[in-house]
Structures are given as C-alpha cells and as structure tokens.
C-alpha cells in the first residue's frame, strides 16, 4: 500500500487526529501487508481498523485523480508545507487537502468568523476591517459560509488581497453553492481552499464546529 493511499484511508477515520495519525501513517508505510490485526497493533480500535480497510477503492482512485490536477495537494502534518499555526492547536488535523497556493498557508493570517445573519453594522465594519488589513499584506482566513465569512473573503479580494477558505466539507463541494464564484476568485488571486475532510464529504452540520 503506497503512502498516499495510507493517508487517504487514515483521513477517513473521523476520530483520528494529529500526532496519532502521523505516527500510524509512518508505521504502516513500513509494513509488508496491512490487515485488521496490524492496524490494531498501532492502537486503532477494531471499528477504526474496519473503517480504514473499508474505505472505497473508488474514493481512493478519484482522490488520486484529483491530486494529479495543478495546485491540488495532500499535506500531511509532518510536511514542511503544513500550516505551522495549526500544530499549536489541540487535536490538529493529521493531514489537509489544499487547492491553491501553498505559500498562502505560511503567510501572516487573521481568522474572521461571524454571524450568517449579520447586521448592516457588522457587514460595514467587517468589510472595512478586512479591507484595511488585506491592503497591508494580511491574509484573511474564513470559512466561506454565508454572512460575515463571505464579507471577509470579498473584502480581501476587493483590494487585491489574499484570502484562505477553510471548509467544513470535502473540496469536491463548494458550500454554499452561491459562493462557488467567490471560491474561484479567491484561487485566482493567490489564495487557497483547505479541508481536513475527505474530498467527497458533504457539508454535515457536526463537521462545522470541528472546522472552526
């Protein structure tokens, strides 16, 4: 089993994060074969081992095809390209899918979050705040959601700044759909789309707190 496939299978285990994922990935890469017994030797539960082994071959093949496209990346947590800020968080993602410019992940960033049903006051000051910072080289990072997230991304792009969108679903889906043009503009201006979830994961409500 090649390293990339190991990472893809481990990313499908929703309760596996950070140091544990990296440790298990490196250990599995050295094994001549991988089965449920071998997986449980790493500390995975039987259920987690079954999830690893049952990850669909079709999903693996489609993910590998996705990674062949320009500016499509799979970034393990031990990669030099992994965002250093994330390593300081509890239960950081063991790997990330990234579409766009990797150097944006190492830029000075401000994370902006807010209400989906914002007030005119929130929109006005959110836009002004993000525009001002973006003109000074700060990368605006948000979640591509309706409301203040969209305001933040658009404000950065309006002044030719850079913005990063961290999604609560796989990168095969832009959610909400109305923000597909916004995501495209973000990529055109040197930003990135980032997700810790497998490419086909839909926008499920319980993933958004994890994304935040």
Question: Model segments located where?
Answer:
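Glycine-biased, small-residue-rich flexible motifs in mid-sequence functional cores and linkers
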Residues: 1-4, 74-212
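Short, small/acidic-rich helices and loops at N termini and domain boundaries
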Residues: 1-81
